[in-house]
């Protein structure tokens, strides 16, 4: 059976983790600090904290915003359910936003409606690796916390941003708008990012969460990065970080894995894009469709999502007969957990939660496996 998800763990990752174990220093320490430095360079942020859970990252991001108790915090209906729970636990009011059916992203219009309902901050989930309308959303003047767990490495060329949109919400460091030469110069990634100036996913909001869980684009086996893109916003987060206990910090054994994953990102992403292009050609002859995205620059290839023409159960059974496991893309989302409560106001999200399947797409797939998946994409009912 070809599994839907598989972490890309090569010898470099294994060696890094084994070295950490041999040194008998697996708790938060030197490698946690090294991961932070690597993240600062890769994501072009002013500062970062490596934490044990994504929920902790969201908690400290919201604390850094200093929202009043009971304030409304807007979430995508397709955001992971832990975000809803975290917002409630902190004493804020979750306000769910519906998404656009063609991209699975919240729109500026949806955010505007959320503000009218009392939203005072937005956690911007960039689902499926697709980037939203940053310019339209930021123009509303609401504090934004980006969630780039699936969109890490995404990139918006300056040609697509107005002067105001390019500034984001804070004073970005200069590297955020330089050509992404470090990430784009490796073989197979194409010349696109190496030659085009722009802004990276994670540099548009005030703070950014990058979950490092097993099925995220970059994995540490668990944990999260919390980043501040701008120099003006980092001191607030830094002050909070100084009071964080070691039990909430990411252990070195996880940090070792994450550091290598970030350094190997371009190599892995180049392979994922090759597979995505191949799969995309396959679905052109089938009954089901993909999502609107710019594969070359704007989006990250987290997996291969497909909006099904029929029911998921039938598609799952068909794929299983061909020894391929597929899963619902949003099985852990807010709308999946709270369908009865929010179905009426989040109709698009509910439909996508029921009919969006993800197919196996990861670098270590073999030729025979890739051919099998491609054939199923063509013939899937």
Predicted segments, located by residue:
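Histidine-centered beta-alpha loop that forms part of the nucleotide-sugar donor binding/catalytic region
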Residues: 78, 92, 99, 126, ...
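Conserved PLP-anchoring active-site segment centered on the Schiff-base-forming lysine
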Residues: 61-114, 319
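PLP-dependent aminotransferase class I/II
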Residues: 33-36, 45-49, 121-125, 134, ...
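Active-site phosphate-binding strand-loop segment of PLP-dependent enzymes
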Residues: 102-165, 173, 178-220, 226-232, ...
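Conserved PLP-binding active-site segment in aminotransferase class I/II-type PLP enzymes
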Residues: 1-64, 68, 90, 366-372, ...
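Conserved SAM-binding loop
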Residues: 50, 75, 226
């Amino acid at each position: 059976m070809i599994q839907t998800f598989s972490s890309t763990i090569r010898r470099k990752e294994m060696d890094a983790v084994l070295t950490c174990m041999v040194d008998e220093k697996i708790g938060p320490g030197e490698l946690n600090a090294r991961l932070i430095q690597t993240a600062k360079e890769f994501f072009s942020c002013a500062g970062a904290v490596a934490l044990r859970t994504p929920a902790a990252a969201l908690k400290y991001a919201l604390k850094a915003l200093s929202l009043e108790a009971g304030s409304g915090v807007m979430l995508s209906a397709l955001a992971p359910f832990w975000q809803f729970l975290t917002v409630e636990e902190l004493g804020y009011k979750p306000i769910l936003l519906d998404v656009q059916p063609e991209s699975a992203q919240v729109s500026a219009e949806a955010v505007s409606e959320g503000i009218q309902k009392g939203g005072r901050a937005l956690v911007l989930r960039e689902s499926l690796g697709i980037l939203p309308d940053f310019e339209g959303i930021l123009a509303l003047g609401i504090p934004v916390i980006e969630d780039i767990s699936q969109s890490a490495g995404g990139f918006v060329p300056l040609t697509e941003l107005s002067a105001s949109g390019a500034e984001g919400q804070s004073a970005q460091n200069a590297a955020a708008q330089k050509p992404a030469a470090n990430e784009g110069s490796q073989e197979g990634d194409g010349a696109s990012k190496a030659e085009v100036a722009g802004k990276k996913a994670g540099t548009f909001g005030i703070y950014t969460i990058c979950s490092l869980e097993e099925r995220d684009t970059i994995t540490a086996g668990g944990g999260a990065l919390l980043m501040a893109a701008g120099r003006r916003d980092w001191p607030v987060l830094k002050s909070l970080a100084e009071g964080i206990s070691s039990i909430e910090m990411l252990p070195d054994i996880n940090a070792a894995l994450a550091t290598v994953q970030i350094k190997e990102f371009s190599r892995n992403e180049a392979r994922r894009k090759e597979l995505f292009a191949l799969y995309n050609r396959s679905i052109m002859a089938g009954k089901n469709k993909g999502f609107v995205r710019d594969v070359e620059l704007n989006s990250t290839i987290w997996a291969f999502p497909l909006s099904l023409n029929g029911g998921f159960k039938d598609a799952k059974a068909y794929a299983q007969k061909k020894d391929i496991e597929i899963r619902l893309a949003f099985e852990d989302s807010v709308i999946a957990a709270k369908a009865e409560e929010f179905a009426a106001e989040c109709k698009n999200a509910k439909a996508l939660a029921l009919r969006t399947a993800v197919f196996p797409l990861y670098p270590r797939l073999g030729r025979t496996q890739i051919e099998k998946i491609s054939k199923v994409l063509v013939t899937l009912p």
